[in-house]
């Protein structure tokens, strides 16, 4: 596994333009690639949206297909403009899906039998993922018909769970090669078909080197097909944080209200800060299943006058909260289900706004946050450590800002969308040469 760090940094040498240059290979006929997702565009998946936009700018003939219907709420204007150019399935497509099964049964009965047998590998101890994979296998029959009709040359799934299951099955039916990206919840834990997908994919992209180490346990062959492709994020942001570091100190947390974010640990740390006499305001931007439990805990800890819940904040508006923040805290944990974050995009965004960061060493986070260099790392599920890190940042503003500036430089070098998405483009071109 010693090669993983080198793979992670292999495309960090030069910056290139996303625009096609006269006489370049971009002028050759573009390969036709299908992207398979659950939803698209999704307001919390700006990293996937940006990848699709930039790959199209590079000249890739890319078509998006979704297993489910439309998510129309909280979309930016740019997302809304692209929303119409998506082929969606969802429950209304069920009659077509059944017809597609009959179509492929007549053409490739042996492959259909193999896909049906694969259902025996689903692990119903994770019913959500297994249910998703069951739907994905059914949807794959209709997707395969569309891929065949549209002359698709490569299939890519943007998640390793149901999306990759659909891509794998459609690849089996059509003979079109497929790849997938492994990120976070989709592989922690992986679904019951992960070995099949790792075996048959021509390329496995991961967001972090930590994910390669995790998936290596399920891969039967060499790791040559693995490629660490860090997400690209817009490097130009509105409003650099002043980091005034004057009371009340502004602490910011952004993310979905789910267990792996560890926001309950941040609230307990906030209680410790209040008990220590620290004057602060804690802002939460996000929504989710744990909204009411978190609000209840806030009340129970007698923090209602210090903690503010903003609800879901669109990507276009979140810059104001970053610009006003003194400290950004992302207290990620490994959930009881083993779900965890890969490398939260909000950490990149906070550093781009020059906000000092406190977070935990979960999964791929240490690939960005080096303790004492680009931010502060603390143990997960340790409110005392979170509180101590916040007090350390408050006590030395200059050192905190210096860490944030080093972190910003690392984001710009490691997560440049032009460089990273060009690397992805080149990977696809190598898979289907023209």
Tell me what each language-model feature is.
Residues 46, 249, 253-272, 278, ...:
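A conserved mid-protein helix/loop that constitutes part of the nucleotide-sugar donor-binding site
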Residues 295-316:
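Nucleotide-activated donor-binding/catalytic signature segment of Leloir-type glycosyltransferases, i.e.
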Residues 312-313, 320-325:
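Short alpha-helical donor nucleotide-sugar binding micro-motif in glycosyltransferases
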Residues 323-338, 355:
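Acidic donor-binding loop of glycosyltransferase active sites
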Residues 347, 352, 356-359, 369:
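Short hydrophobic beta-strand element within catalytic cores of glycosyltransferases
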Residues 368-372, 376-383, 392-398:
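Conserved acidic donor-binding segment of nucleotide-sugar-dependent glycosyltransferases
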Residues 385, 392, 399-414, 420-426:
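A short, well-ordered alpha-helix in the C-terminal region of glycosyltransferases
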């Amino acid at each position: 596994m010693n090669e993983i760090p080198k793979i992670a940094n292999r495309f960090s040498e030069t910056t290139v333009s996303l625009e096609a240059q006269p006489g370049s290979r971009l002028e050759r006929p573009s390969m036709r690639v299908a992207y398979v997702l659950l939803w698209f565009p999704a307001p919390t998946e700006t990293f996937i949206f940006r990848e699709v936009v930039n790959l199209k700018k590079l000249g890739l003939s890319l078509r998006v297909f979704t297993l489910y219907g439309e998510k129309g709420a909280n979309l930016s204007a740019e997302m809304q403009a692209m929303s119409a150019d998506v082929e969606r399935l969802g429950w209304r497509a069920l009659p077509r899906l059944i017809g597609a099964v009959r179509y492929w049964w007549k053409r490739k009965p042996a492959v259909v039998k193999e896909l049906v047998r694969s259902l025996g590998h689903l692990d119903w101890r994770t019913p959500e993922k297994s249910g998703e994979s069951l739907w994905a296998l059914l949807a794959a029959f209709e997707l395969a018909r569309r891929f065949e009709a549209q002359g698709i040359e490569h299939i890519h799934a943007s998640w390793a769970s149901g999306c990759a299951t659909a891509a794998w099955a459609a690849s089996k039916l059509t003979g079109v090669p497929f790849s997938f990206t492994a990120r976070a919840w989709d592989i922690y834990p992986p679904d019951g078909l992960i070995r099949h997908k790792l075996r048959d994919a021509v390329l496995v992209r991961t967001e972090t080197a930590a994910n390669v180490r995790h998936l290596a346990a399920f891969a039967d062959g060499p790791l040559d097909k693995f490629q660490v492709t860090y997400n690209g994020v817009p490097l130009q942001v509105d409003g650099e944080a002043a980091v005034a570091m004057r009371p009340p100190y502004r602490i910011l947390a952004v993310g979905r209200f789910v267990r792996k974010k560890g926001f309950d640990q941040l609230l307990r740390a906030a209680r410790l800060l209040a008990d220590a006499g620290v004057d602060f305001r804690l802002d939460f931007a996000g929504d989710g299943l744990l909204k009411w439990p978190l609000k209840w805990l806030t009340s129970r800890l007698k923090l209602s006058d210090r903690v503010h819940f903003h609800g879901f904040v669109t990507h276009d508006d979140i810059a104001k909260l970053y610009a006003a923040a003194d400290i950004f805290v992302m207290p990620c944990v490994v959930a009881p289900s083993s779900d965890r974050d890969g490398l939260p995009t909000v950490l990149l965004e906070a550093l781009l706004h020059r906000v000092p960061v406190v977070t935990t060493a979960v999964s791929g986070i240490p690939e960005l946050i080096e303790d004492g260099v680009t931010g502060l790392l603390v143990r997960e599920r340790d409110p005392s450590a979170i509180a101590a890190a916040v007090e350390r940042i408050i006590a030395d503003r200059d050192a905190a800002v210096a860490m944030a500036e080093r972190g910003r430089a690392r984001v710009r070098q490691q997560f440049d969308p032009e460089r990273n998405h060009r690397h992805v483009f080149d990977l696809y071109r190598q898979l289907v040469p023209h």
